[in-house]
Amino acid sequence: MRSIVIIVMIGFALQSTAQPTRIDKAIQLAESEKQTFAATHYATAQSLASGNFVVDYYRCEWNINPAIRYISGSVTSYFTITTATSQIVYDLSKQLTVDSVRLRKKLLSFSQKLNNTLVIHFSTTLSPGKRDSISVFYHGTPPDTGYFAGSFVQTTHGNNIPVLWTLSEPYGAMAWWPCRNGLDDKADSIDIYITHPSQYKASSNGIPVSEMPNGASITSHYKHRYAIASYLVGIAVTNYSVDSRVIPIGNHNVPLIQYVYPEDLTTFQNNTFTVSEALQLYSSYFGLYPFAKERYGQTEFSRGGGMEHQTNSFVTSATENLMTHELGHQWFGDKVTCGSWQDIWLNEGFATYLADMFYTEMIDTTYYMPYVEGDLSYIVSQPGGSVWVNDTTSIDRVFDSRLSYKKGAFLLRMLRWTLGDSAFFKGIKQYLNDPQLRYGFASTADLQRNLESASGQNLDYFFRQWFYGEGYPSFKVQWGQDSITGQVNFIVSEKTSVPLSVDFFKVALPIQLMNGSKKKTVTLVCKFNNQQFTLPDPGFKVKSIAIDSDHYFISANNRAIKQPSLQFTSAAISAPSLQGAKIWVSPNPVTTVATVTLQNVHGHVQLKLFNSTGVQSWTYSGDVQSRSLQLQIPFGSYAAGSYRLVLTEANGSTSSAMIVK
């Protein structure tokens, strides 16, 4: 059986110079983020908020002094009841003290549980659809051990200047405020009021509305009118310097506001162009920045890596890879959030891929291929591991830099090659704007559904292999060129690194044919081992081939083996021309008469049959009006052996098929 062969002309040579520093920094980013999140993700960490209500709105009023690790204030929640109930349950650390809970002005009874929940009791049963609000007044020192460690941090910077910041992914929000802390509910909007000593500035989500003086303190007000997950809410307070500017994106002007340690202000200002260019680039590919009606911002904090707080990424430095990675999360992680930590690649794989896109398109295309090669070497440095997270209780597994970040990003590279740019980006935009997903939660199945809709392809095999499956293939390509017709024959086989998980990877494998400066790339759609392919004469004598030289697929230890006399004796053969024409011969092998079917041809065509010594045995010349033609070749008087049937179209392109008697 033969498969379709696609020919693509290429006219450039790839550089081989490596730039390991960027590769190392990208891996270090993933590892530092893993360490950042490690403290807040343990086997016992989970949201225990009740499922009988959803939160519509939060109004958070907090008192913060960055010199003291302490919080007091209130959180008012507007909610809608989904199941008749007389109580609702919030997530809240048992270490914080709840002073009172009020339904408007009425005090409600409540109880704090050892499992870090706050149970609120109503005097009557609330019916489904009932919308109401409660205010929780509380105070205390947030826990800093176990799975809450690192979620509410007080430290210093510069000349011993106090700074306080939060980082709540994945379950750290409940350490410092009452909320629904799971991946099943987003508040439609939020207002945040932070009262702090007047010598400091506060940073948080959304638009900075006002700074109201209150004697020795100031109340900073932020408002955010987009749906937001609890773990994406963040605050920081210190003596920030503020850098504000406007970034033009098409017909929109998006404010960029940065809160930076004074000692680092110049560095951030000198690198703001990176954020500006990335905002414009990502908007051109994935649609306008998701929170364009408000702003984007960066806040400096003192933890390794960064955190994609919605509209306001917390970053530890003004480095290109970190800033572009966290910005990418605003589309992938914030606008559309993974609905399970098993699908963390929908956040981290995408953000890693976007940072790679920025580098190759805006910084330096010369070093992009060595960077891809470095990523590939890192991914295949171990034989196993899936992008799908099979153990969400392990922080090392959830935030695995090799699998969730790098292999996740490479999965997108493979999808882009498999689908083509048009269908790939169309599908990603559909995913981001899917009414069921936009400003909500998504699964890998949701991404697959939108990519299939955009491309018309069934991608079950792809996600079964590359998302759920472990490992990678090693390809062996045997090849030879016919000295008479010039056509090139291939036999492709593969071995997989974890055959018990994936015994064969179906791929559209690029093969580059080369002879000095002459190069053509063909794509072999590999569906099974030892599959045979025939390629029409590429127009030059092929000296060598390269297997997936641009690294569109994860693979390792590939081998190309030249066999000049490679011949086939398979039963059914198709060989498209440059325009996609096909020759089908049946039966094959033949005894008396062979039926030849031409498809996707038009205009004048010529068919010639040659025996194994190159002698012409039969010919046909005529016009094709309906893009297909069927005719018969009498083989009764021909000697046993192999024959070449060569099709020449009106534009001069040729295809050929082998017929065996």
Identify the function of each model-found stretch.
Residues G73, T166-E169, R180-T324, Y353:
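Hydrophobic helix-coil surface modules that form long, contiguous segments used
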